[in-house]
């Protein structure tokens, strides 16, 4: 978020002007009436017609990467929702691979040895702020909120 609130409106503006290209005449340049792209991806996942997962995140260009990794953690690695949203994440929205500070340094070294450019983020939770609720096979609600950000996941 931008941290900017207009008196009387009661909401905070987003901070996505940063994703525009400041150079004129390019596809992502700032121009009157031009909308920015959106990486919003609120997601509902079903199994045999039953809701099993509701998940989403704020986080600008990092949203899709964060949400995707948390979904993979739940479905493929059988993690609880708290484990899934707390696991280390990476992102690659350009030629650079961004890794959070909790990705082991040997992983970064192996990627760099293979010719990838890697940027280590100084923060431990810096790729989207994923929150979700998993519905277990027994019908229990299992919520998880990214521990690096404000928020809570509550099933009612």
Regions found by a protein language model. Give the residues of each.
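Proteins synthesized as precursors that undergo proteolytic processing into mature forms
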Residues: 1-124
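Cofactor-centric catalytic regions
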Residues: 102-156
């Amino acid at each position: 978020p931008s941290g900017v609130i207009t008196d009387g409106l009661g909401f905070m503006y987003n901070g996505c002007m940063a994703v525009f290209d400041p150079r004129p005449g390019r596809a992502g340049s700032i121009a009157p009436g031009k909308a920015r792209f959106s990486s919003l991806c609120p997601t509902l996942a079903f199994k045999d017609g039953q809701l099993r997962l509701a998940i989403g995140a704020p986080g600008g260009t990092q949203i899709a990467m964060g949400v995707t990794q948390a979904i993979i953690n739940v479905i493929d690695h059988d993690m609880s929702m708290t484990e899934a949203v707390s696991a280390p994440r990476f992102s690659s929205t350009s030629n650079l691979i961004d890794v959070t500070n909790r990705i082991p340094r040997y992983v970064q070294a192996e990627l760099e040895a293979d010719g990838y450019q890697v940027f280590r983020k100084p923060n431990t939770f810096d790729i989207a702020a994923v929150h979700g609720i998993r519905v277990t096979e027994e019908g229990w609600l299992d919520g998880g909120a990214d521990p690096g950000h404000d928020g809570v996941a509550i099933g009612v």
